[in-house]
Amino acid sequence: KCVNNLSSIGKALVGFTHDNGGRLPWQLISSQKRDHFGANYVEDLGPVFSTAAMKSELQTAEILWSPCDAEREAANENAAKGWSGYNAKTGNLISNTAISYVLIKGADIGRPSTILSTTRNLTFCNLATGKWAGADENPIPDHAMSGLNKSQGQLVLADGSAMQSTDADLGSFGKI
């Protein structure tokens, strides 16, 4: 289910680029930012997933929650109830605590093997140095997800393929 959700997020992001000159939400030019965010543009999950375009692509907040992330289930259930009211232009944003995934700033739709999004359990927001944090570590990292152990994560590529991942996939010499 988590990989399926990431696949849906990947498709939503690719759909967004088709309508925006090949640009992802964080790559928009000023006029496009105004169109999608009004005066509320911030490079953050809540604003991106609260744009009308992304909401239309995703259809429900439930896609933004991973079954591997029990800690965020209640917040996501509340977000699902308020889904119709979220609007980046008015500043009514979905809470980051309702989202189990992160977006990768260096993603490039023109490069199909780049990573668009991952589960939120990366140790660093840097794919070259990050590892997958796990609930089996002691102490448990803040960004660990209850259903994923150390060296377990999931990701979606710009070509739309979503998969499970290990630490061997990440880093300067990673498989991906």
Q: Which residues make up each language-model segment?
A:
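Short, well-structured segments within or immediately adjacent to enzyme catalytic domains
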Residues: 2-176
